[in-house]
Structure formats: structure tokens, C-alpha cells
């Protein structure tokens, strides 16, 4: 009887560990070739073709002209107006606003695909679905970034790198290393596309807070906050000091916040026009169904925490576009790409076949062991 009792206790203990403490598995191999090919096609459609046929958006044309003009004279933010981050204008300066910037965009999209695949594979363990998600990312880029939104495309690899670290923690809560790198990657993304990065960082923070509250990981939450803040500061202050040194710090802050400071509800003559255009375009992309699934669909805690925050990110991004006084342009909807991708990621069903088969094998071994004991007794 003692023998049977010990075996039963071990069986119950192992069953509990399978459900409560996920075992970290080896990730699926990254499909580098397909990501390289898809990112090249997305770059050609969104950047090369608009350059060739003169279809670059007015805002993007102004940014590229600024890169050329900086070679002639003047300082960024002081002599030239710009709402994007400092590193974006540095690249525009280096390439003189030419089509050569497409090479950097290609590298950025390739990196974004790699890190998004890792994040999806870690969170849900579905290699095929992770590949589909990366493909959908490039479809969104090719469609929404046709002739504009290049600053956000450059920020995507840093945004998705931080996402890959966060999803690793959500999937394996005991492994919460790397949050200093989360802050550093978000700082780099901020110096390309400030406002979308701030929204994405808020979404990740809300997702982690919700997950930690549900699991009671308060100490983890404090560590993650301070580690991320440290990582952000390590890059933000050295890079931001350039604007202090050139005397353009105040102008940089005011111009970066210009899209937010000029939002208006009652004195906006373009309000109805913006609402109809951006909402219909977002609905056509499937945002309504994704929002409903993100808010109300039942899913594991690690996915539900992110889906709620991502839904808020989509709504806030659309709200900024609707309340904006800027002229209507479809490329401005590129800001919702990271949040749509997050909603798609959290809507993937987790692969439990591996864990189930592992538990079945363990039960089969224990059953055969019991049979052997019964024979000898």
C-alpha cells in the first residue's frame, strides 16, 4: 500500500506541474529565407514603387526633403519642422532623402519579421500560425505604408524585440530576465516614431500589469518596471542630449507632441470626414472583429492580458487620427499595425498537443510500472 501511495503522490505532483509551471521548450527554427523574401517584397511595394511613380505622401515627401536640406544648412527642429524622432532624421540626412533609405527599411522589416516570429512561437507554440502572422504583417505594411509611414517601419524591429521578451515572460513567468533590454529597445524605437512607441510601451505595460495582478507577481512587477526604466534611460539621455547641446530640446519636444497637442473635437472641421474615412478603412482591415475577439473571447491569461491592452491601443490610435486636423491620408493608418498584429497574435489558439502527449507518456510509464509491481506482489 505504501508503494501505491507513493506512486499516486508522484503522479498527482507531476500532473500539477504540467498545468501550473510551463516547461520551457526549444523554439521553432526561424524561417529566415521566407522572411527575407517577404520583407523585400513589402519594401518594394511600400517604398520603391511610390518613389518611382511619384506617389509618396506629402508628409513623407517633406521628411525626405528635410534630409536633403540638412546637408545645405541648419539644424533639425530649430530650422526644420519635424514630428518624428531624431534617429529617423539622421538616416534621412545620411541618405539625403533618396531612395537608398529603402535599404535600411528592408533591414528593419526583416528584423521585425524575425522578432515577431519569435514572439508568436514563444507565446502560443504554433510554428505555422507564427509564419502566417509574419506574412500578414508584411501584407499590412505593403498596403498601409504605400508611400508613407516610414518612421514607424524603422521602429518595428525594436518594438517587436521588446514584445518577444515580454511574451517570453508571459509564457514562462519564472523567466523574467531581459527587461533592461526592453527599455533600451523602446528607447531606440522612440527616436524613430515617438508617439506610436509611447502607445506601444503603454500597451505592453498594461498587459504585464494585468498578468502580474492576476498571478500575484507584485515583486516581479516592481523589478520589471525599474529594469525597463533603467534600460530606457541608458539610451534616452545620451541620444536626447544632442538636442540639448544644439539648443533644440524645447523645439524637439513641442514638435514631437504637435500631433497630440493639435487634437480637437469641437473646432475640428474635418471630424466627420476623418471618422468616416479612418473607421471604414479600419473596419475593412478587420479591426472590428479583432477588437471584439480581443475584448470578449475566452483565452489563456497570458494572451488575454495583452489582447485587452492591444484593443485599447487600436482605439487610442484611431481616436488620434479622427481628432487630428491633418489632411486625410491612408498612410497615416500605419500607426495601428503594431496593435493589429498584437490582436492577431493573442487570437491564436495555444498548441497544447505537446504537453498533452507528454502527460500521456508519463501516465503510460506509471501504469506499466504499476503492472510490474502487481506481478511481483
Language-model features: where?
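Perimembrane helix-loop-helix junctions
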Residues: 199-233
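Short acidic/glycine- and proline-prone juxtamembrane loop motifs at membrane-interface regions
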Residues: 145-155
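Transmembrane-helix signature of polytopic, membrane-embedded enzymes
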Residues: 113-143
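Membrane-interface alpha helices of multi-pass inner-membrane proteins
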Residues: 178-194, 200-205, 316-322
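Short hydrophobic alpha-helices at membrane interfaces in multi-pass membrane enzymes
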Residues: 166-188, 218-222, 226, 308-312
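Membrane-interface transmembrane helices that cradle and orient dolichyl/undecaprenyl
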Residues: 160-181, 290-301, 348
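Hydrophobic/aromatic-rich transmembrane helices and adjacent perimembrane loops
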Residues: 322-357
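Transmembrane-helix motifs of polytopic, lipid-linked glycan transferases
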Residues: 102-125, 161, 165, 292
Amino acid at each position: 500500500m505504501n508503494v501505491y501511495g507513493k506512486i499516486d503522490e508522484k503522479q498527482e505532483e507531476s500532473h500539477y506541474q504540467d498545468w501550473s509551471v510551463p516547461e520551457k521548450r526549444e523554439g521553432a527554427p526561424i524561417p529566415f529565407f521566407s522572411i527575407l523574401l517577404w520583407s523585400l517584397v513589402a519594401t518594394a511595394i511600400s517604398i520603391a514603387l511610390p518613389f518611382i511613380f511619384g506617389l509618396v505622401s506629402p508628409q513623407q515627401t517633406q521628411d525626405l526633403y528635410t534630409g536633403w536640406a540638412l546637408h545645405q544648412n541648419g539644424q533639425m527642429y530649430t530650422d526644420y519642422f519635424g514630428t518624428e524622432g531624431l534617429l529617423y532624421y539622421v538616416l534621412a540626412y545620411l541618405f539625403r532623402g533618396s531612395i537608398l533609405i529603402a535599404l535600411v527599411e528592408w533591414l528593419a522589416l526583416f528584423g521585425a519579421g524575425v522578432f515577431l516570429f519569435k514572439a508568436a512561437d514563444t507565446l502560443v507554440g504554433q510554428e505555422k500560425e507564427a509564419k502566417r502572422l509574419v506574412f500578414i504583417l508584411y501584407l499590412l505594411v505593403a498596403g498601409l505604408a504605400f508611400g508613407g509611414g516610414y518612421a514607424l517601419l524603422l521602429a518595428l524591429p525594436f518594438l517587436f524585440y521588446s514584445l518577444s521578451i515580454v511574451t517570453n515572460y508571459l509564457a514562462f513567468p519564472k523567466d523574467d530576465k531581459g527587461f533592461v533590454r526592453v527599455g533600451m529597445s523602446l528607447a531606440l524605437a522612440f527616436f524613430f516614431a515617438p508617439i506610436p512607441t509611447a502607445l506601444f510601451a503603454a500597451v505592453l505595460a498594461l498587459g504585464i500589469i494585468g498578468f502580474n495582478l492576476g498571478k500575484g507577481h507584485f515583486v516581479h512587477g516592481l523589478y520589471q518596471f525599474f529594469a525597463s526604466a533603467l534600460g530606457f534611460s541608458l539610451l534616452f539621455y545620451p541620444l536626447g542630449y544632442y538636442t540639448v547641446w544644439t539648443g533644440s530640446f524645447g523645439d524637439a519636444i513641442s514638435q514631437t507632441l504637435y500631433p497630440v497637442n493639435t487634437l480637437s473635437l469641437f473646432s475640428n472641421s474635418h471630424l466627420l470626414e476623418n471618422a468616416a474615412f479612418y473607421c471604414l478603412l479600419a473596419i475593412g482591415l478587420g479591426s472590428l472583429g479583432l477588437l471584439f475577439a480581443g475584448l470578449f473571447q475566452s483565452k489563456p491569461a497570458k494572451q488575454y492580458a495583452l489582447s485587452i491592452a492591444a484593443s485599447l491601443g487600436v482605439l487610442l490610435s484611431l481616436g488620434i487620427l479622427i481628432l487630428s486636423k491633418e489632411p486625410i491620408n491612408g498612410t497615416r493608418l500605419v500607426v495601428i499595425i503594431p496593435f493589429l498584429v498584437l490582436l492577431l497574435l493573442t487570437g491564436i489558439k495555444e498548441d497544447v498537443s505537446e504537453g498533452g502527449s507528454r502527460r500521456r507518456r508519463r501516465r503510460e510509464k506509471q501504469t506499466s510500472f504499476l503492472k510490474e509491481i502487481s506481478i511481483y506482489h
